Amino acid sequence: MRTRVRPLDDDDLPDTLALLSAHPVENLFFLDRIQQGGLKRSRLGCPVYGAFRHDDLVGLVHVGSNLVPVADDEEVLAALAARVGPWRTSTSIMGTQRAVLPFHEHLTHLSERAWGHPRAKRTDQPLLVIDAPPAITPDPRVRIVGFEDFESYFRAAVDMYTEEVGVSPLDPSNGYRRHMLAMMQRGDTFGILDEHRIVRWKSDVALSWGGVCQIQGVWLDPALRGQRLSAPAMAGV
């Protein structure tokens, strides 16, 4: 069956939301982005391509710094990869295992040089979900962190990113700093501070749509690890 791929715009929002909202947890990045910027490239900052069979939307790919394919069909993933092409502008591919792995294979076939040598592959990274109150007592010290404590929070965020990814997020454009300031402006930065107002534990509400949100950026001061402090802190969020 022929698969046609074209750029999406705001006229495609109803079909796009219907496709993504069928699995809101795994598609939360996409839903959050569309909620903020729609599908118009000038607002979103990057293109989104849709794959169609007849007039039905059957797959998507977000082509920004994060390359995010959404599809279950091998032919659809191949068509989306062909539209992205052999020229790499993204720094990572993220999404479900069933979409990302074959999508990356198709890209590698297009250009081994551009796509065939990733710095790391996280092929088994479970997506954990809680949809009921925590079964443990929350840490009462967890609170929303405000701008008066931004510098301490930002240092913890940089340490977290560097530990997890293996490279520093700092760059001359201050993009990571602006990103953290934007989350703090929304009230999405949580932490535990000691008596000296130093952040010892942190996490962020990075994405949200409807009744679903994603917690990430979790970090605990290395000096406090091994004391079973993170679980009660997460429950506090």
Explain the meaning of each model-derived region.
Residues 3-8, 18, 23-24, 31-92, ...:
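Conserved donor-binding loop and adjoining core beta-sheet/short helix segment
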Residues 46, 123-127, 187:
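Short hydrophobic/aromatic beta-strand or adjacent loop that forms the aromatic wall/cage
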Residues 53-57, 62-140:
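Acyl-donor-binding surface of acyltransferase catalytic domains
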Residues 74-83, 216-222, 226-237:
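Conserved acetyl-CoA-binding loop-helix of GNAT-fold acetyltransferases
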Residues 138-213:
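A mid-sequence, solvent-exposed acidic-amphipathic segment
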